[in-house]
Structures are given as C-alpha cells and as structure tokens.
C-alpha cells in the first residue's frame, strides 16, 4: 500500500462502516454518471433538445477528458481503496484510482455550466452536481480523497483550456471546408486516443460522430438551435428515448465499440430527423 493511502483508508473504512443502508441505492445510481450511458444520454439531450453545436462540444470535451484521465491513471498507477481493502468497496473497478474520472468529469461539466450561464441556479445545480458525484466516489469505496482532489484539479485545468481555446478553434474550423473538418474529426481524436489505452468505444465514437456531423450539416438533418426550455426538454427526452431504442436493437449483435459507433451515427442521421418529424407533425 502507498504510505499516504494508509490514513485515507482509515477514513474510507470508517465511512464504509457507517453507511446508512437507505442511501446505498442513491449512491449506486450516482455511479451511472461515471459511465458511457451518461454520455449517451447527455449528448443527445443537448444535441437534439437545444443545440447540435453544444452537443458536439460536449462529446469532444468528455472524450478529451477520458483521454487525459486514462493517461494519468496509467502514469501514476495508484490503486483504489477497494483494491487495498475489498471490504470497503460497494463496487470495485479494475482500472487505477488516481485521478478520479468521476470527480474530473463532474468538475469539468459542473464548472462549464456555471461558467456558461453564470446564474444562481447554474451555481446551485453545478455545485450540487460536483459535491454529490465527488462524495459518491468516496462513499462507494472506489476512490481515495486524494484521487478526488486530483480529478478536481484536472477537471478545472481542462475547463480553463476549453475556455481559452474554444473560440480560436471554432473560428479556424469555420474558415475550413466541410470536408477538411471531417478529416480533422478523424485524425485528431484517433491520434490522441492511440496515445493511451482509453476505451476503444471512444475511438469509434469519435470517427462516427464526425461522419454524422458532416452528413447532418451537408444534408440539413440537424434541428435548429432552441432556447425554449420546455420545447428543448421534450425534444431532448425524445432523443434519449430513441437512443435507448437504438441501443436495445444493436446491443448483442455487435462488439461493444461498434455499438457506440452505430449509436453515434444514429444520433445525427436518425434521431434528429425523427424528433423533428414527431415535434413538427
């Protein structure tokens, strides 16, 4: 065991021994926010419900976060509490513990929400999301406090990088031909992801989402941006439902990476036109 994990393991053990059973289902549910299924719900909800541009930004931002997180996990190689002491973990994952991917993602997305909207409700939702997901990693016994802290630091770093670069990047892409943007959507994500053992489904997704966005723009399949919250929620919920229908249809028939690739194409080439037809009919 790593020396500075000893004291933290005492804290995790104490937390595990005093977990109220009625809270267990809540924190097990919160683990969903650190899974591909969360991305599969969030991106379509935003893409179809409100803005395909924001949906695309979120996808690439989360994909970049996964790559960075995987790189540091492999570089540092620290174990999880449940690996050091199996009795403390309600769950136990096989990957390394530092930094926490869940804490990193919630800091990135919660911070992005606060930065973008700058309202009281954005602060309430963003801070609550960060606090709940971060504490859930400790409650479930899958991370040490230092893992969560490391995730926060990386999440804030990625948010800072996004804020500083998104404008120039999108201005550059706007000046390029659509086909050039398609090529970049192939080369850059795959090059980054090949540098680590990041999940294979993100490599396939990155290519599929680029193809889908290209064809969607070329054929005019995307929905116009929407600022009506009620209308956006209806469109978003329909999109998530159609994505789950797609998952049920293809799961079991294809390898997992290809399942997510098909779903990425389904989002831009199938879900958006279907939702437009349903909402406008």
Language model: regions and residue ranges:
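Membrane-embedded catalytic cores of phosphoryl/pyrophosphoryl-handling enzymes
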Residues: 27, 42-43, 56, 66, ...
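First transmembrane helix
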Residues: 37-46
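Charged, low-complexity surface patches
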Residues: 19, 61, 201
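N-terminal transmembrane-helix/juxtamembrane module of multi-pass inner/ER membrane proteins
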Residues: 1-38, 69-95, 223-242, 251-281
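Interfacial segments of alpha-helical transmembrane regions
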Residues: 45-65
């Amino acid at each position: 065991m790593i020396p500075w994990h000893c004291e933290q393991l005492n804290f995790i053990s104490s937390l595990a021994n005093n977990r109220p059973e009625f809270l267990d289902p809540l924190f097990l549910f919160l683990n969903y926010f650190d899974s591909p299924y969360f991305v599969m719900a969030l991106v379509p909800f935003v893409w179809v419900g409100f803005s395909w541009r924001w949906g695309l930004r979120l996808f690439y931002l989360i994909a970049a976060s996964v790559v960075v997180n995987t790189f540091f996990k492999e570089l540092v190689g620290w174990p999880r509490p449940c690996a050091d002491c199996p009795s403390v973990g309600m769950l136990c994952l096989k990957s390394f513990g530092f930094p926490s991917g869940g804490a990193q993602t919630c800091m990135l997305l919660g911070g992005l929400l606060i930065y973008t909207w700058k309202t009281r409700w954005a602060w309430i939702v963003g801070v609550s999301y960060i606090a709940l997901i971060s504490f859930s990693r400790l409650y479930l016994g899958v991370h040490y406090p230092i893992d969560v802290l490391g995730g926060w630091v990386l999440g804030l770093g990625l948010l800072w990088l996004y804020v500083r670069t998104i404008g120039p990047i999108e201005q550059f892409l706007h000046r390029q031909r659509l086909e050039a943007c398609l090529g970049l959507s192939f080369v850059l994500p795959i090059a980054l992801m090949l540098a680590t053992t990041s999940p294979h489904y993100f490599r396939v997704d990155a290519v599929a989402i680029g193809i889908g966005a290209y064809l969607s723009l070329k054929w005019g399949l995307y929905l116009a941006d929407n600022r009506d919250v009620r209308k956006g929620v209806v469109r978003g919920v329909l999109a998530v439902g159609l994505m789950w229908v797609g998952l049920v249809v293809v799961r079991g028939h294809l390898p997992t990476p290809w399942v997510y690739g098909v779903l990425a194409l389904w989002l831009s080439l199938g879900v958006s036109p279907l939702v437009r037809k349903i909402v406008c009919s």
